[in-house]
Regions:
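N-terminal secretory signal peptides that target proteins for export/translocation
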Residues: 1-10
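Bacterial N-terminal signal peptides
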Residues: 14-26
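Serine/threonine-rich, low-complexity intrinsically disordered segments
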Residues: 4, 28-29
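Carbohydrate-interacting regions of secretory-pathway proteins
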Residues: 31-268
């Protein structure tokens, strides 16, 4: 073996320091690799999600849901106009719009939630365009009348209209991704995930509302960011508000009134 000869002790010392540094670096790399390979470093145990008992049948309310319409009464609802008890028609587990009474909304207010609702356009529906089975699900009611954010309800089974006003649209804002409308006389379902807008202390918008909507099990709105509250004329805009009721619309068209059942919400 050939031994390396050093010209001076200083060079010899520098060589050994360099070798020691290289050894330390190699050890550190191996230590880091070992840490990355430790699966426990990426495991999280808290918080623990709450246990929710799912419904026996799809569409029925899970154990933590707030039942908004139980098929028997309107204890969870009031008139939008004056806050008096809602007087839409309840019969045989079905809620039917009373067009002479006006819109109704929940007594409770909500922020973010999951909502399930079923509706039916009458089999004998008449009219056309927007005057055929028109109603609306307001995801947050922010005042009287039609103030708020409207998810359109309309008969669009062989009934053309403007596309940002058909069923599944965020009215006058977002065209639905598909038209899975069933025939009049058949029950239809809305499943909604709503994220309310957030406002700064000065009333300015911090983050917009977002909504994901399934109509009859088909995705029609995919995490859509709303531009503001619904407006029939003009551009939508935001106005600061807090937790809000959910509203159902009694539309003024002359077609036969629509019906609802199985309405529940899971606040999140």
């Amino acid at each position: 073996m050939i031994m390396m000869q050093f010209a001076c002790p200083l060079l010899k010392r520098a060589f050994f320091l360099s070798a020691l540094s290289l050894l330390a670096g190699t050890t550190l790399v191996h230590a880091q690799a070992d840490s990355l390979d430790d699966h426990k470093l990426t495991e999280v145990y808290t918080p623990v999600p709450p246990v929710v008992t799912p419904a026996a049948k799809f569409g029925e309310a899970p154990s933590d849901a707030v039942i908004l319409f139980n098929g028997r009464n309107l204890d969870e609802w009031v008139k939008v106009s004056d806050g008096s008890p809602a007087d839409w028609i309840v019969s045989k587990d079905i809620l039917t719009v009373n067009k002479t009474s006006g819109n109704i909304q929940t007594k409770r207010s909500f922020t973010n939630y999951q909502l399930h609702l079923e509706y039916r356009i009458p089999a004998n529906i008449t009219g056309s365009d927007q005057a055929r089975g028109n109603s609306g699900l307001f995801l947050a009611s922010t005042g009287k009348g039609d103030d708020g954010y409207e998810l359109q309800i309309l008969d669009n089974y062989n009934n053309p209209t403007y596309t940002n006003g058909q069923v599944g649209s965020i009215y006058k804002q977002s065209i639905p991704l598909a038209n899975p409308c069933r025939k009049p006389g058949e029950w239809q379902t809305y499943d909604v995930a709503w994220v309310a807008p957030v406002f700064n202390t000065d009333g300015s918008l911090a983050s917009p509302a977002k909504v994901t909507v399934f109509l009859n099990g088909v995705l029609v709105q995919n995490s859509y960011e709303l531009k503001g509250q619904t407006r029939y004329r003009g551009k939508p805009y935001y106005k600061a508000h807090g937790p809000s009721p959910i509203k159902l619309q009694a539309h003024g068209d002359k077609s036969e009134p629509i019906s609802f059942r199985n309405i529940w919400v899971r606040p999140s």
